[in-house]
Amino acid sequence: MKFEPELESGKLIKRYKRFLADIKLDDNSERTIHCANTGAMTGCAEPDSTVFFSTSSNLKRKYPNSWELSVTENNHTICVNTLRSNQLVVEAIQDQNIKELTEYDELKTEVKYGSENSRIDILLTGKSLPDCYIEVKSVTLLSESGQGFFPDAVTTRGQKHLRELSEMAQLGHKAILFFAVLHSGIEKVSIAHHIDQQYHSLLIDAIENGVNILCYQAEMSSKEMKIVRKLPFSI
């Protein structure tokens, strides 16, 4: 995924109202940018940290700039735009960069499924293959020694998705929970049972029901983002 034009940068002043952030540019002018991430953003939104933003060509947008990346004091890069994770995984599958998913012929997104009226992030189909339901989750919470965690806050929506994936697996389909790691400092991923015990419990049940876990990390810069490596996962 290439950023065209290349992302611009500034210094974070503050994030507020969940969807907005004020930044200071190199010329000391200030600008309000849109923040697509409504989560806790723990460690991703420290005042005076460097942020990178894109500019929309949509002239009707009230805030044409979108917060894409943050750089931490340890020089780690984090993608804070939650819309990017699905786009990255779709691109990686289409480019045959996810070795576990190269046999499928057709890819669809946002398809209705399940008994709880959800929409699956990605549905793969192929001749003589079980349908493959993929739910994508972005991982940006870093603890010590390279340990990444998901979720970074209690997620009832995520719990619902686990129940839906379990249902698909029990019906004989392939069901995958795909962790897209969008923090350059993360070396391995685990479930944050200390944050959301119910999610942890539901994932154990989902795995027992046949849900598979994939965990891949992206490389990120002001010019592009792409899925590049598989990371270890533990429950």
Curated annotation (Swiss-Prot):
It comes from the Bacteria. GO terms for molecular function: DNA binding. Belongs to the SfsA family. PANTHER family: SUGAR FERMENTATION STIMULATION PROTEIN A. This is Sugar fermentation stimulation protein homolog. It comes from Aliivibrio fischeri (strain ATCC 700601 / ES114). The gene is sfsA.
